[in-house]
Amino acid sequence: MGLFGKKDAPAVDKIIAPEIQVMLLGARRVGKTSMLASMYNSFSNVAAGTNLAMSKKGGKAVDDSLEHMKTLFRSSHMINDAVPGVSDFSQTQGFDKIDFMLSIARKKEKPRVIRFVDCSGEWINNRTKEDEVGEEIEKSEVVIIAIDTVLLMEKNGRYNRLNAVQSVTEFIINNMNPDAMVNSKKMVLFVPMKCEKYYHQNNDSGSIFYQKRMTAIVDRIKEEYAQLLNFLTSPNNKKYFTVGILPVITLGGIEFDEFTIDNGKELLTEHIQYRYCEPDKFAPEFCDRPL
């Protein structure tokens, strides 16, 4: 889908082998595909009105997720109303992966091609795809670890186990040994998503969390992912890995409200309730930063 006319945008059929591969990792249903959709939407908006031309190939699930997120704001509602269907974002089924190619070029210049590989959460808990996983990691220059910020922060992290921190940690340590890789230098980005509530609190001068909330997210990630961060920044590995923490606003006008579950019961996606908030529209922020 070109953002410009056919004469400006590189033809989708002529997209060549990628120069950069980005791999998205995270637990099941944390929202990797939704984040990828918001990233694509944000970068499209940045490119609009410039001399950049974009084309993409594949990624129907990305299109579906983007359309679903926009649809949430088309129904009649008021600020603070509960959001219907917010938990039904597209998810990668079984051991499937989303393969999405993005071609970016200035007019009359050779395009740069980025390939996004969005792996299902099952990959990090199962060794049957080990060879395929190793191949994709080998080819990736950037690895994005998607984190559900609500699970990370609420109830003092009671439900953070659903972010599968230990599984993600072991997966990366087992599959990203610099000594065993040809393409050993990588950027590893921890990307907490669904930060709307915490971002609003952080910027509300009347809140007890004013200027504190976003820092608290970063601190919690450093605490929960300490083993992985220690591995990535160890004296032997730090020359290979560039590490960053980049919070993103996935939706903009929808934020976490409450859990509707009794203590002791298993938390399901439908137990996580969201509500409409300002700016009351699909307005992701900072999603283009990982790009």
Where are the predicted features?
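Switch II of P-loop NTPase G domains
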Residues: 85-144, 151-158, 171
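Surface-exposed acidic, glycine-flexible loop patches that form ligand/cofactor-binding
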Residues: 12-15, 107, 134-136, 177-182
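Active-site micro-motifs of SAM-dependent methyltransferase domains
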Residues: 41, 121, 196-197
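Residue-level preference for short coil/turn positions at secondary-structure junctions
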Residues: 18, 31, 138-139, 184
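Extracellular structured ligand-interaction cores
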Residues: 19-21, 97, 111, 185-187, ...
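Conserved GTP-binding G-domain of TRAFAC-class P-loop NTPases and closely related GTPase folds
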Residues: 139-291
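Conserved G1/Walker A P-loop phosphate-binding module
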Residues: 3-94, 103-114
